[in-house]
Design a protein with these regions (language model features):
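Core catalytic lobe of class I
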Residues: 1-224, 261, 270-273
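S-adenosyl-L-methionine
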Residues: 1-5, 226-267
Length: 273
């Protein structure tokens, strides 16, 4: 986040997957094996006040870097999403939706003392109440079989094919980011991810013809991002990504997922001081 103030640019859309503050020493299951839920020191809670201050600080920076008609998406669970929503409201954002991402393949609850955690939340907000944000309503209706898309999305968690260059502990699935990008941006729009991780947002942006800037502090994940970006130079892999994304779109307008040469770009150039 230290770099963000030095970026002399405003983005059409921001997707943020900030720390959830859920690394508490617990265990979960992945591929049939017990694993720790700890993601790293960056995901450990520093206490309510410090966690809340952190969310407010980065959300304030992001609001400065958002175009007047741009929108921001922020993912989370009950561990952090209420703090994010409060900070958004206090900073002047207008929350449009709280998307419930229902995973159809969640890990089981090992303790058997409460309901299985199978959802995450994604807040979608515009810069202010008076902003005229972009929403591709017709496309969302089309990929939902001709009916209005609701705010509960049933999509799988990260699949094996998305781990070809390694696995980030909180990596988001490509179909999820693709839907978000298609819903709220146009081709050649600029997208920012201030917690880029392994750059699923960047991969989806590239595949769908958008411009992207990602910020990430961990060298390991930067290398993973570069490897994933390099993969896209293989036209067969890029075509495979389109096909996999299209499986989650019940539509006859499949040309939105066809591999094609990018349109000439005559838009804004990004500057980093």
């Amino acid at each position: 986040m230290e770099l963000l103030p030095n970026i002399n640019f405003q983005f059409d859309m921001i997707f943020a997957d900030p720390p959830y503050f859920l690394s508490n020493g617990g265990i979960s299951v992945q591929s049939g094996k017990q694993v720790s839920v700890n993601k790293g020191n960056w995901d450990k809670s520093q206490g309510f006040e410090k966690d809340n201050d952190f969310n407010r600080q980065w959300l304030a920076l992001c609001r400065e870097k958002l175009t007047d008609n741009g929108t921001i998406w922020v993912s989370g669970t009950f561990h952090n999403i209420f703090s994010v929503a409060q900070s958004m409201t206090e900073l002047g954002y207008k929350i449009l939706n709280c998307i419930t991402w229902q995973k159809n393949n969640p890990p089981p609850n090992l303790s058997c003392r409460y309901f299985t955690h199978s959802t995450e939340f994604i807040l979608w907000a515009k810069k202010s109440a008076k902003s005229k944000h972009y929403f591709n309503y017709d496309l969302m209706k089309s990929i939902n079989g001709g009916t209005q898309m609701r705010d509960v999305w049933t999509l799988p968690a990260i699949a094996k094919w998305e781990k070809s260059c390694g696995k980030h502990p909180t990596q988001k699935p490509l179909p999820l980011l693709s839907r978000i990008i298609l819903a709220s941006t146009k081709e050649n729009d600029w997208i920012l991810d201030p917690f880029s991780g392994s750059s699923t947002t960047g991969i989806a942006s590239t595949v769908l013809g958008r411009r992207f800037l990602g910020l990430e502090r961990e060298t390991e994940f930067l290398e993973m991002s570069k490897a994933r970006r390099e993969e896209l130079k293989n036209i067969q892999i890029k075509q495979d990504y389109y096909q996999r994304i299209s499986k989650y779109a019940d539509t006859k307008c499949m040309n939105i997922f066809e591999v094609r040469e990018p349109e000439p770009y005559y838009g804004r150039d990004l500057e980093i001081e």
